[in-house]
Amino acid sequence: MARDSLSDAGLHFDELNKLRILDPDVAQQTNELKEECRDFVDKIGHFQKVVGGLIELVDELAKETENEKMKAIGARNLLKSIAKQREAQQQQLYALIAEKKMQLERYRIEYEALCKVEAEQNEFIDQFNLQK
């Protein structure tokens, strides 16, 4: 009966017969909730560490990807410039070939003219020798 009157006043005895303000069931549930919260906080901390590690890994991969992308762009630009250089060099060579063909044609015409002059001079010499 004394316990009931104390319970009505909000005072309770625990399993060690200590006087408590909270009901022993509520105190036990509070302790269980406290432990669950502690476990939850530990799990959240572990989760944050794992997520932090994943974020760092993704950041590193992003940096590596960006570096490789820049290398690929540089290589592509280099190939384009080499192709343009080769095309320019090819055009220069075509121009040189055309120039050499024109020079060859001039030399051929000059050779034919010189052959004609030589033939005329030989004919003149032969006629001159015959007249003597």
Curated annotation (Swiss-Prot):
Subcellular localization, as worded in the UniProt entry: Golgi apparatus, cis-Golgi network; Cytoplasm, Cytoskeleton, Microtubule organizing center, Centrosome, Centriole; Cell projection, Cilium; Golgi apparatus
InterPro entries, per database record: FT20
Swiss-Prot/TrEMBL keywords: Cell projection, Cilium biogenesis/degradation, Coiled coil, Cytoplasm, Cytoplasmic vesicle, Cytoskeleton, Differentiation, Golgi apparatus, Spermatogenesis
A single BP term in Gene Ontology: regulation of platelet-derived growth factor receptor-alpha signaling pathway
Pfam families registered for this protein in UniProt: IFT20
Coiled-coil parts of chain: 87-114
Gene Ontology, cellular component aspect: acrosomal vesicle; centriole; cilium; cytoplasm; Golgi apparatus; intraciliary transport particle B
Function per UniProt: Involved in ciliary process assembly. May play a role in the trafficking of ciliary membrane proteins from the Golgi complex to the cilium. Regulates the platelet-derived growth factor receptor-alpha (PDGFRA) signaling pathway. Plays an important role in spermatogenesis, particularly spermiogenesis, when germ cells form flagella.
The protein, known as: Intraflagellar transport protein 20 homolog
Gene: ift20
